[in-house]
A protein has these predicted regions:
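Short helix-perturbing small/polar motifs within transmembrane alpha-helices
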Residues: 1-58, 64-170, 174-217
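Membrane-proximal helical linkers
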Residues: 162-167, 219-244
Length: 244
């Protein structure tokens, strides 16, 4: 593996670990019911993963419930939900047994993306995120999508020795419409339900996200080659299940 890829992977893992430790220091038993509901929905959504055509990575609708959680949950709970969601997406029904560093990178990338999205949205709204839930979801989504896509695209490009621009282009071709639909649904739910009851809207929304998953799964299956060419090196298989 190129030294640049190793350095980048290490940087992301260390950054994600520090954020998890920071969030753990703020733990409190408040809003445990809402926390467990968002945690369960995000974990279930993470199992609905789709392989991105032309890339060695997967995507899932877990981000929808992360965005809704950013309206009602404190920072540490959003980080915890992000961590569990990423672990489920990496480990559940993987095409091949993932390596520890691969799982750690995927988890760190999701934690970083959700943390930056949460902090940006609440900074812009000056702590009034719950008062403007739709705006909070839109702001958070506008950060989560590009950051997460860039982190995943960059590691794939570095590991496989490909230019970043075409890797990002392939990623956005599939991820962008998926995210836009999810953000639209999340914004709709956050606008209909009060911040304290957005979790009810999240429960109602879950079947819709399952149908969205089925649609994109069938669409991506038609775009995937019937047989995958053998990899020329172990490095090209290294991040076969990178999550986005």
């Amino acid at each position: 593996m190129p030294s640049q890829a190793k350095a980048y992977i290490s940087l992301i893992i260390v950054s994600g670990t520090l954020l998890v430790l920071l969030a753990a220091g703020s733990w409190s038993p408040a809003n445990l019911r809402q926390f467990l509901i968002y945690l369960g929905l995000a974990a279930l959504a993470s199992a609905l993963k789709i392989r991105i055509p032309g890339m060695e990575g997967t995507m899932s609708p877990n981000f929808v419930f992360l965005l809704l959680g950013m309206v009602a949950l404190p920072f540490w709970q959003v980080v915890a939900v992000s961590l569990v969601a990423a672990l489920v997406q990496s480990l559940w029904a993987s095409a091949k047994r993932p390596r520890l560093v691969q799982v750690a990178f995927s988890a760190a990338a999701v934690v970083l993306s959700s943390s930056l999205a949460y902090k940006f949205a609440h900074f812009v709204l000056v702590g009034d995120g719950p008062e403007f839930p739709v705006v909070c979801v839109i702001l958070a989504g506008s950060i989560y999508l590009p950051v997460n896509s860039a982190l995943v695209s960059m590691v794939i490009g570095l590991v496989e020795g490909q230019p970043l621009k075409p890797v990002c282009a392939r990623c956005y071709e599939w991820v962008f419409p998926y995210f836009m639909i999810g953000i639209a649904f999340a914004g709709l739910v956050s606008g209909v339900y009060a911040p304290s009851t957005v979790w009810k809207g999240a429960l109602v929304l879950f079947p819709t996200m399952v149908l969205t998953y089925v649609y994109f799964m069938n669409r991506s299956a038609g775009a995937l080659p019937t047989t995958m060419p053998p990899s020329s090196s172990e490095d090209e298989e290294y991040f076969a299940e990178v999550s986005s």
